[in-house]
Amino acid sequence: MPPLPGAELVHNPLQLYRYLLRCCKLLPTESLQHYYRHSVKQSFRVHADEDDPERIQQIIKRAIEDADWVLNKYKKES
């Protein structure tokens, strides 16, 4: 399961934030979109002070994997 198109272009936290918000629009219901949009925003705030480049890349990689998993989960259910 490759990540969504555009995932390879994510190199910094702001690009990740925008990518994840676009992924939320692909979820099937408005309530799911709202839930995951809120989750993305909260996670961005929590990690806003992160300054270690290696840790930032680790967070980006994990967030893309998690977004792919969530989208595949709801794609199979609907």
Swiss-Prot record:
It holds the Pfam family Complex1_LYR. Belongs to the complex I LYR family. LYRM9 subfamily. This is LYR motif-containing protein 9. It comes from Xenopus tropicalis. The lineage of its organism: Eukaryota, Metazoa, Chordata, Craniata, Vertebrata.
